[in-house]
């Protein structure tokens, strides 16, 4: 869900102004998540991510499944949503979507500094990848997901995890 705070209200207005239906049906009292980006001297982005006690995690699987539109054909998720503590809920939603013939898409966008357990996060992200028909990954994502492998071997490992998926490498 979106938060009742200023960010959640602004995002809700943006969705409404762009004819996007907010299907959850409630706004959470918890705050919006926050990402702060800083650029290093080398011009590389560095992230500070605030993901604990936030609105978008204040939902259960039945509420998320009920919010899927009847005509939904594709469910996209980003890896910031894949906190290992939320794995049972997310797993239930993904399997319910697949049971309804909804295709799954993930931007793996690996951010290991934003999760409670890096090993569980990587394992769960690989599990999610195995369910998806569409996957977006960068070379940096692959190196973070498979730190012991070269980029080409990491891509091969990703392809082996989801052999029929369409993969976009950026």
Which role does the model predict for each range below?
Residues 1-34:
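A glycine-rich beta-to-alpha transition motif near the start of alpha/beta enzyme domains, typified by
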Residues 14-16, 22-23, 44-170:
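Ribokinase/PfkB-type carbohydrate-kinase core domain
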Residues 30, 41-43:
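Short strand-connecting beta-turns/loops that link adjacent beta-strands
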